[in-house]
């Protein structure tokens, strides 16, 4: 197995773990009674988490992303043009300090 393939696999597993953990933190209306959906399509994009009633999207960001550049900026601009607020959270932050992530999300309510 090539180094790049192995690196990609590690990133994918880490992202999956972070996504699963965040899903667990957001489930059962734990954040002020608001419901979050996971992996929902909006236009040509699939967002990680969305609270429809608050028009709030949470996107997990891995080390492979560069904030504010390329397709991520276009994606965010598109979602904001539809009235959504987009919060970007590093997957490493979800895994290392989930309480800080919840505080960050709660600040938008």
Regions found by a protein language model. Give the residues of each.
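Short secondary-structure junction/hinge motifs that connect adjacent elements
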Residues: 23, 39-44
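Solvent-exposed, charged helical/coil patches
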Residues: 1-35, 81, 109
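Residue-level signal for inorganic ion chemistry
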Residues: 26, 40, 89
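Basic, amphipathic alpha-helical patches used to engage nucleic acids or provide basic targeting signals
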Residues: 11-15, 43-108
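Short secondary-structure boundary/capping segments within folded domains
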Residues: 28, 39, 48-50
């Amino acid at each position: 197995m090539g180094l790049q393939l192995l690196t990609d696999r590690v990133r994918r597993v880490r992202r999956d773990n972070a996504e699963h953990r965040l899903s667990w933190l957001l489930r059962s209306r734990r954040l002020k009674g608001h419901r979050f959906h996971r992996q929902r399509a909006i236009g040509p994009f699939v967002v990680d988490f969305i609270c429809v009633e608050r028009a709030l999207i949470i996107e997990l960001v891995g080390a492979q992303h560069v904030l504010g550049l390329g397709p991520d900026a276009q994606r965010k601009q598109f979602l904001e043009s539809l009235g959504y607020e987009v919060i970007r959270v590093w997957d490493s932050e979800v895994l290392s300090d989930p309480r800080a992530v919840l505080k960050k999300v709660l600040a938008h309510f």
